[in-house]
Amino acid sequence: MKTKAAVRNMRLEDIDHVYEIEASSFTSPWTKDSFYHELLENPYAHYLVIEKDGHLAGYCGIWIVMDDAQITNIAIKPEYRGQSLGETLFRSAVELCKEKDARRLSLEVRVSNHPAQGLYKKFGMQPGGIRKNYYTDNGEDALIMWVTINE
């Protein structure tokens, strides 16, 4: 039986699980303290999580400043990848940005991360530039992608 995934706002009690996903997804993961800071002290930060079968399967962070939104991080737990959960989560993030009256949405993605770029292109995101040597673990460039979401 296929169960539906549910997206909700991230809570403090989710941080341990979110950190596990972060650490398994990125070579230079954010710290747990960074997530606490985001939820408790950053007025621009909005975090969503996606659950499947009662388990936290992924998360997405967004900063919304005036009419500009930026995805700070998005990740799906390795064992849940390939189930369209990233697409569901990203769609929810875009909807949140629209609700908050953001006009533009941007993000950075590794130039080598073609699967993620493909997902973002499904939502109309287009390449907008390169940040040279953006990633500190290996000096890889970041591709800046953006889309207008509210006109």
Curated annotation (Swiss-Prot):
- Top-level lineage group: Bacteria
Instruction: Give the source species.
Output: Bacillus subtilis (strain 168)
Could you confirm whether the keyword Cytoplasm appears in this record?
A: yes
Q: Does the keyword RNA-binding apply?
A: no
Q: Where is acetyl-CoA bound in this sequence? A: I74, A75, I76, N113
Annotated Gene Ontology cellular component terms: cytoplasm
Catalytic activity from the UniProt record? N-terminal L-alanyl-[ribosomal protein bS18] + acetyl-CoA = N-terminal N(alpha)-acetyl-L-alanyl-[ribosomal protein bS18] + CoA + H(+)
The family database entries (NCBIfam families) matched by this protein are listed as:
rimI (TIGR01575)
Biological role stated in the UniProt entry = Acetylates the N-terminal alanine of ribosomal protein bS18.
Give the keywords, sorted.
Answer: Acyltransferase, Cytoplasm, Transferase
Residues in N-acetyltransferase domain copies: 5-150
State any single GO MF term: protein-N-terminal-alanine acetyltransferase activity
**EC assignment:** 2.3.1.266
**PROSITE patterns on file:** GNAT
What does the sequence similarity comment in the record state about its family? Belongs to the acetyltransferase family. RimI subfamily.
Protein name in the entry:
Putative [ribosomal protein bS18]-alanine N-acetyltransferase
Database matches in Pfam families: Acetyltransf_1
Write down the top EC class of this protein: transferase
Q: Which cell locations does it reside in?
A: Cytoplasm
Which residues are responsible for catalysis? E108 (proton acceptor), Y120 (proton donor)
